[in-house]
From Swiss-Prot:
InterPro entries: Calcineurin-like_PHP_ApaH, DNA_Repair-Maintenance_Comp, Metallo-depent_PP-like, Mre11_N, SbcCD_nuclease, SbcD, SbcD_C. GO terms for biological process: DNA recombination; DNA replication. Transmembrane segments: none annotated. Belongs to the SbcD family. Heterodimer of SbcC and SbcD. Pfam families: Metallophos, SbcD_C. The keyword Nuclease applies. SbcCD cleaves DNA hairpin structures. These structures can inhibit DNA replication and are intermediates in certain DNA recombination reactions. The complex acts as a 3'->5' double strand exonuclease that can open hairpins. It also has a 5' single-strand endonuclease activity. It comes from Staphylococcus haemolyticus (strain JCSC1435). Keywords: DNA recombination, DNA replication, Endonuclease, Exonuclease, Hydrolase, Nuclease. This is Nuclease SbcCD subunit D. GO terms for molecular function: 3'-5' exonuclease activity; endonuclease activity. NCBIfam families: sbcd, sbcd_Staph.
Amino acid sequence: MKVIHTADWHLGKILNGKQFLEDQHYILNKLIDNLKEEKPDVLVISGDIYDTSYPSKETIRLFEETIKIINVNMKIPTIITNGNHDGRERLNYGSTWFEFSQLYIRTQLELMSTPITINNINFYTLPFATISEIKAYFDDDDIKTYEQATQKCINHISKIIDPNQINILIGHLTIKGGKTSESERPLTIGTVESVESANFNIFDKVLLGHLHHPFSITDNIVDYSGSLLQYSFSEVNQAKGYKKLMINSKGDINTKFVQLKPLRELEEIEGDYSAVIQGDVPVKNKDNYFHFKLKNMSHVTDPIIHLKQIYPNTLSLSNITFENHNKSTYADFKTTDDPTIIKNFYKTITDEDLTNYQEKKIHQLLNQVINRED
């Protein structure tokens, strides 16, 4: 049996004011092209279909068109769980009759112990839910952490699971030790959100979403597909795609990562402002989404405007001087004279030295201040 595992589409994603729908439409078409060749028995989407619980009409239309092609036209059974970005009720709308075409949208805790059986393989779903929601569902006030909440859910499933069959869990959560990125919204505030992978040993495979790195964790059972696109500059140079599982028998499950090439990537460029403007700094693709980390631009008014004229998808700009500058301690200031403090500050801000004229004027102004205090 062949299973395609994907997650974290984040449809409708906006990064620094840039809408990603065009890029998402492109990468979903790439996924569809691959599905036509792969001819999988099941497609699994492990949450965060949308980037917000209130997606736009255009975003919903993109999702519906994609699923229609995959599930209706190509007749691929599809299992979807919600993530922490999704609006549970909106995603769940119509799920009852969708199942007649083998489109299974599972967002309710009530169904966690009801497997979806396809080709004698049981797919259990653990939809994203908050600690308080899981506590209320089990009427258990002793649940305080995600670890405890997850254990409660797994224990509930274990009561009906058949260990002699192939059992796969689909979920959306953080495994302890997994690689994180800036674009992953925390699952909870004020408590540890990660859980131990050992909780899932009753399953033959666990297909997760939430962490965007396709190799977030190395584990024989637990696996992340990663996101379809790079969604933060912490994901620069990170390959994106999906996972392909070949399930031959219980104990014989092989997983392979399949990379998808996006329309545009996120790219970070570090260097001198003038060199970048003059095109002397190599870039992968001028149409990529850029974060520039530059120096020597204090003389330029609104440098990001000039950058966008050459690199239209410039999303952010930072002064590399600030990032590379070692912070001075209070003790440093106490033992340094005022002119030197000002001189060092100017160097930090502009990456340039004061001219003789500027130093002379600073001395004059400092003397005026001292004389007034006297």
